[in-house]
């Protein structure tokens, strides 16, 4: 059955010359969803409805983005205004302080300062000359010091002192000579002093050589110390480089032992110290190879050699046994008294 009237539906997209591929790309670019590209009535209606919904959603997104953009612009404008105000404050501060600096950098003021400085220099013309003289004097003194005390010394120098051996001086040169004399006051002086204040009395000094328990001995002094005086003598042979701690400790213990004898009211024996590094000939004559070592002598003979480190109490008992007739201490059990002769040492004269 054929109806008298026929209806045709034409797609507007196709009539306008658009291809399906261009329509698809356009819809994808605008984020529209197209479910069907058929150009029938049902497809066109469905496409129109979905596109309408997507257009509404895109409008909402545009409005939201617009609000965010407006808020961001407001915040940025506020920050910009704050920074502008801070810059203005800094400029004001610079202007306030710049006035003072400008006054200091004024060329007229600088000329005045230079003029006053020149006037002061002209009033005292000897200042620069004195400085030059001082520099010349300093240079002369420095050259003299370098000549007297050279920084580099040749070890093979024939004028090198034997007692120095790297030290540059010997302790005996400070303590061996009596530099202070004991002088008695006259009666007239005593009467005059008694009339005045008692606090202003002269102090009588005594040299350090009288109170030192151990005295340093050289090879040149050996013969006089041993053979001219036959009283008891103890010889401490030490080495400053070999076992330095033990050498120092042994010397301290020996000084304490001598102090014990003093406290007992007895005259302590003489005690000398020989430096093995300096007095090599004397050490070889004494046949000492282990340091430290103490040799007990009396009347030109060697009574005992102590090579171990003893305490002050043990050393005081050994001294009491050999020199004061005390009982034999336990530390000397099994030790036989030797009668070794004290050796002679030839002192070569340069």
Swiss-Prot record:
Transmembrane segments: none annotated. One of its GO terms (biological process) is regulation of DNA-templated transcription. It is found in: Plastid, Chloroplast stroma; Nucleus. InterPro entries: MRL7/MRL7L, Thioredoxin-like_sf. Disruption phenotype: Seedling lethality due to deficiency in chloroplast development. Residues 78-107, 182-201 are annotated as: Disordered. Keywords: Chloroplast, Nucleus, Plastid, Transit peptide. Residues 1-48 form a transit peptide. One of its GO terms (cellular component) is nucleus. Residues 82-93, 186-200 have a biased composition (Acidic residues). Plays an essential role in early steps of chloroplast development. Involved in the regulation of plastid gene expression. Required for the proper function of the plastid transcriptional machinery and protein accumulation in thylakoid membranes. May function as molecular chaperone to ensure proper organization of the nucleoids in chloroplasts. Is a necessary component of phytochrome signaling for photosynthesis-associated plastid-encoded genes (PhAPGs) activation. Mediates the degradation of two repressors of chloroplast biogenesis, PIF1 and PIF3 in nucleus. PANTHER family: THIOREDOXIN-LIKE FOLD DOMAIN-CONTAINING PROTEIN MRL7L, CHLOROPLASTIC (PTHR34669:SF1). This is Thioredoxin-like fold domain-containing protein MRL7L, chloroplastic. The gene is MRL7L.
